[in-house]
Structures are given as structure tokens and as C-alpha cells.
Amino acid sequence: MKKIIIATNNNNKKNEIIDILSDIHFSCEILNINGLPDVDETGDTYKENAELKTNSVFEYIKKTNIKADAIIGDDSGLEIKELNNKPGVYTARYAFINGRGKHHSTTDNIKYIYDIIKSDKTEAKYICYIDILDIKNNIHIGSFGKLDGFIIKRNIKYNKNYFDYDPFFQLQDGRILSDISRKEKNKISHRYNAITSSLYIKG
């Protein structure tokens, strides 16, 4: 059984990846490691950021006795057509880099986006790039996934139970992403599509 490390300290993201791997019956053991390094997403692309994360964890475990077969890292973002596919790789800090909010504040990000988009409903998509560092073969295996929909203006208060932009993301069938079950989301999400497209996962 392959031993896998998920290169994130974000429990929501980690649990989503674990659930997806379980749902698709990918046989592996997830290694829970405390103190993984936090990585600054300095890349200009999803691919660069995802590889920064897997490389950082690889350098970290080389200093330990931890044995793993692969490291999974991802970078994801929201692309809004009206904004020429921004915020993209800057999704988590979009308001901050434009002087309009705190670092990694979804509340500030959505307020800023609402201020600069003209439409109450505008085409958007979630993008995810999965990088799997195959340690044995010393190669990076990457794959993209997306989820098409819309960003809609809603007068709701963001709370800790929400994940990313989900309460403001409308699926093409009209449902709000935060309203569907986690199990159902994991079968359609950008992260699911990226993971299931990976040649490493396909074997």
C-alpha cells in the first residue's frame, strides 16, 4: 500500500483530498505529519505553487525518518470571466494585494469582488492543479481539474462553516455549492476532477 503525504496544513483541503481518494477506492495510507512547513505561494501559475508545496515537504521529510511513496500538493483558484479570469492564483489574497483587506480573508475577498464586478451573476470557474511528487521515481506528475459555474451576489454573512467561495458559487444546474453535501461535492469538484485525471492515480 502506498504511503502518501498531503502537503497542506489546511484541514478542509486535506479532508477533501482524503475523502476523494477514499471515494475512488485509491488504496493508500495517509501519513499524518505535524509541523509541515507553510509555503508562500510565490509562483505565477497553479503548477508552480503546487510544486513549491510538494518540494517543500520533500525537503522537510528528508531530514527525518519518515518514509513515503508520494506527496500530493495542490493549488486552486477562482477565475471570473468578467475579470479576465482573475483572481486566479491570487484568489486567497485578492483583496489584500489590492489594498482592500486582510491576507487570506474570504470575507474581504468577496466584498472586493462584489465591488468590481458589474453583474449580479457572472460566469466563473474553480480551477485546481494537483501535483504528485513520485518520490521513488523522482518525478512530478501534474493534472488540472475545473468546475464551471457562476459567482452570484448574495446578501449573506460568511462564517467558519463555509469553505472558500462556495456560498457564492452557483453550479450550472442552479444550486449553490455550499448547499450540497460534501459527499456530492467531492464527486464534481475541481479537486476531484484534477485528482481523477492524474496518471499517478490512474496507475
Residue ranges and their predicted role:
Residues 2-5, 12-20, 24-203:
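Anionic-ligand binding patches
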